[in-house]
Each structure stands twice: as C-alpha cells, then as structure tokens.
Amino acid sequence: MDIAIHHPWIRRPFFPFHSPSRLFDQFFGEHLLESDLFPASTSLSPFYLRPPSFLRAPSWIDTGLSEVRLEKDRFSVNLDVKHFSPEELKVKVLGDVIEVHGKHEERQDEHGFISREFHRKYRIPADVDPLTITSSLSSDGVLTMNGPRKQASGPERTIPITREEKPAVTAAPKK
C-alpha cells in the first residue's frame, strides 16, 4: 500500500490552514501585529513563507533580553522580566554565578491560557565580591543585579626607569 507524504511547504488547496509556519510564529503571551490576524498571502506564490521573527519591528526584540555590563567601577546585569511579578522571581548567588529563576503557573490572558518559566545564569567577574551583589525590579519590568568592582589596592603610581651602564647579558653566546 502506498502512503502519500505531504510536504508542509507545498500548498494544498483543500487544507484550511494555508500557513503551516504560523504556529511557530506565535509569540506566546505577547501582543499581536495586524498582519498576524490575516491569513498568509498565497497570491504571491504557492511557496510563500512568512518573514522571520527577527525582521519584526524593534518593539518586539525587547522581550526576555538581557544585558551584561562591566564598567570601570561596577558590574551589572539587566534582564527583561516584565511578564513576572516580584513574587514569581528568585535571584541567588552560588559561588561566582548569579542564578535567576522565574516561573508563573498557568493563567488566562487575552489570547487564552499561558504559563512561563525561565532560568538564567551569569558569571560574576573575579574582581566583584559575590556578597555585594544586589537586585532590584523597576516599574517597567527590568530586573537589575549589580555589584561594585574591587579597586586596585593603593593608588596608581608611575615607576621611573633607570638606565644602567652594564649589559644585561654578560656571557658571550656559544658557537
């Protein structure tokens, strides 16, 4: 018995879901663009593919991103956690690593039900004392963790260079 194999990128006229990639285009828990509400255009080509998500408007690329900064006097990490309340977040330091965990159980939003969970780890630089790491959550949902960098012991000083009259190498090279 022969079995027909249907490739998802080939348009099938009687299949009601003409854009198989739309399931993977869902940004779960995020707001929708107008183009997300319309079926994918098959009038251009039967092989039309939706543009990749990284080509979306810049407002879409701020979700879940983190930024690690090592400045002259401090180390800081900024993490977008706008979908989590302070009670749903945990920040802890284990050795030289900051661990961030966020989890919220299933709840209803405007698109249906959603649950989220993430784990992030950040290595603390050697010149930052793990005991000095602090964290705060801004009103727009950015979690900031930072700590001061240790300053070099003592002030900076210039070392003078003296000139000697005798050579550094006293033995003649062997032949």
Swiss-Prot record:
PROSITE patterns hit by this protein: SHSP
Residues reported to bind Zn(2+) 2: H104, E106
UniProt keyword annotations, A-Z: Acetylation, Chaperone, Cytoplasm, Eye lens protein, Glycoprotein, Lysosome, Metal-binding, Methylation, Nucleus, Phosphoprotein, Secreted, Zinc
Localization per record: Cytoplasm; Nucleus; Secreted; Lysosome
Binding site for Zn(2+) 1: H83, H111, H119
Pfam families: Crystallin (PF00525), HSP20 (PF00011)
Region annotated Disordered, chain positions: 139-175
Positions carrying Phosphoserine: S19, S45, S59
Cellular component GO terms, alphabetical: cytoplasm; extracellular region; lysosome; nucleus; protein-containing complex
Chief location: cytoplasm
Residue numbers bearing the N6-acetyllysine modification: K92, K166
Gene Ontology terms: biological process: negative regulation of apoptotic process; negative regulation of DNA-templated transcription; protein refolding; response to heat
InterPro entries: A-crystallin/Hsp20_dom, Alpha-crystallin/HSP_16, Alpha-crystallin/sHSP_animal, Alpha-crystallin_N, HSP20-like_chaperone
Single annotated GO MF: protein homodimerization activity
Residues carrying sugar: S41, T170
PTM sites of type N-acetylmethionine: M1
sHSP domain span: 56-164
Its job: May contribute to the transparency and refractive index of the lens. Has chaperone-like activity, preventing aggregation of various proteins under a wide range of stress conditions. In lens epithelial cells, stabilizes the ATP6V1A protein, preventing its degradation by the proteasome.
Binding partners and assembly: Heteromer composed of three CRYAA and one CRYAB subunits. Aggregates with homologous proteins, including the small heat shock protein HSPB1, to form large heteromeric complexes. Inter-subunit bridging via zinc ions enhances stability, which is crucial as there is no protein turn over in the lens. Interacts with HSPBAP1 and TTN/titin. Interacts with TMEM109; in the cellular response to DNA damage. Interacts with DES; binds rapidly during early stages of DES filament assembly and a reduced binding seen in the later stages. Interacts with ATP6V1A and with MTOR, forming a ternary complex.
Family, per entry: Belongs to the small heat shock protein (HSP20) family.
Name of the protein: Alpha-crystallin B chain
Organism of provenance: Ovis aries
